[in-house]
Amino acid sequence: MEQSLMEKLTILADSAKYDVACTSSGASRAARAGSIGSCYAPGCCHAFTADGRCVSLLKVLMTNCCSFDCSYCVNRKSNDLPRATFSPRELAELTMEFYRRNYIEGLFLSSAVLVSPDYTTERMLAVLRLLRGQYHFGGYIHAKAIPGTSPELLEQLGYLADRLSVNIELPSEKSLSLLAPDKGRHSIFRPMKPVSYTHLRAHETLRHL
């Protein structure tokens, strides 16, 4: 049976509640003519729910269907829980609808690893391209980099998001191999260099969208 948009939102918002979102964007950008929304430092998130979610962001996963089986993660493939996946169009339209109703000030987007890191990031990029390009969304976007994603895709993600971050789950390579056998130390740390580089170039690129 096909899931409704509300069913997907309920599942994927709940699955995102353990992902850490910073409340300060570090970005300052006024609205441009013809765009919707703006982004001002020190960020657009100031109210929190009891479980740590920032209530002025739509904090959601692209999907909670994961190819990995990390023992600490609620979305691991061996866990028996409801699964859902947004299409890029569904999530972009949902974000805009919430924004127009003044429910949110921006989007926090993360994802489980569907098929592969690159495939997952391509779908996240499709959402951001719709928001920035077709819908002229100028609000705050925080995207989570998926470990193992190619540098080229991370660079594109950096052009479109105000903030990029990556989860570093464990302090040692031995612990990582025990608890997250599908991940490697280098796949986690590798995204950090492109993140800092792409941030410097992102705002210039956005001017031409």
Say what each PLM segment does:
Residues 80-92, 119-126, 130-157, 163, ...:
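Canonical radical SAM enzyme core domain
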